[in-house]
């Protein structure tokens, strides 16, 4: 996401963890080449975890395994430098399935400095346990399959208009302020 933001000529700051290996340094170097501020990326053992997803021919995830990294160093960084990081930012993009304490810290600084928060997820089952966070952010971004998981419904057969009508009711009843659902080649 930080790289995509930089590619449209904005200058994001990326706050994250990477492995303390050559791979972690490669991530930092690539982001820096795209003019992403990498000052707040910390190098820690196993900082990126391990992720594997298996997709079917239609592009849907059919299996996934993961080993989440310990993000306590990120929580510590926010406790130490949160004011410095957030006071002058334009908005905040966060992965909502980070450790609860980390998300709470980010939401605290967002409220303190009146910043909008845009959230995505990589593990919908974790996000499902944190529905209260969805009510505290400004906009939740997910794909059609993730929206179906969130609302315990099947959306794959829906076109954009039907999806919009159906989601409007669900988003309102869930008290989510705003939600963007990507639909692959459908919009």
Residue ranges and their predicted role:
Residues 7-90:
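Conserved N-terminal subdomain of the carbohydrate kinase-like
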Residues 16, 41, 94-96, 119-122:
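Glycine- and other small-residue-rich loops at beta-strand/loop junctions that grip anionic moieties
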Residues 1-7, 107:
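Histidine-anchored nucleotide/phosphate-binding helix
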Residues 81, 102, 126-130:
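Short acidic active-site motifs
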Residues 57-60, 67-70, 97-99, 123, ...:
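Short glycine-rich anion-binding loops that position phosphate/pyrophosphate groups of nucleotides
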Residues 107, 111-187:
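Conserved phosphate/ATP/ADP-binding segment of small-molecule kinases
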Residues 27, 105-108:
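Aromatic/hydrophobic pocket-lining residues that form π-stacking "cages" and hydrophobic walls in ligand
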Residues 20-21, 97-101, 121-126:
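Short beta->alpha connector loops
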């Amino acid at each position: 996401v930080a790289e995509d933001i930089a590619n449209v000529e904005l200058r994001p700051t990326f706050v994250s963890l990477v492995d303390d290996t050559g791979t972690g340094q490669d991530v930092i170097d690539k982001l820096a080449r795209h003019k992403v501020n990498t000052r707040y990326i910390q190098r820690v053992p196993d900082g990126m975890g391990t992720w594997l997803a298996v997709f079917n021919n239609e592009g849907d995830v059919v299996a996934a395994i993961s080993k989440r990294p310990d993000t306590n160093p990120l929580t510590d960084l926010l406790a130490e430098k949160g004011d410095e990081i957030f006071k002058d930012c334009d908005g905040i993009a966060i992965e909502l399935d980070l450790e609860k304490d980390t998300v709470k810290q980010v939401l605290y600084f967002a409220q303190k400095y009146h910043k909008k928060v845009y959230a995505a997820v990589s593990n919908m089952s974790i996000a499902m346990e944190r529905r209260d966070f969805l009510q505290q952010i400004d906009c939740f971004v997910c794909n059609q399959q993730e929206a179906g998981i969130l609302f315990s419904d099947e959306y794959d057969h829906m076109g954009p208009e039907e999806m919009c009508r159906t989601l409007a009711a669900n988003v309102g009843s869930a008290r989510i302020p705003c939600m963007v659902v990507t639909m692959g080649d459908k919009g």
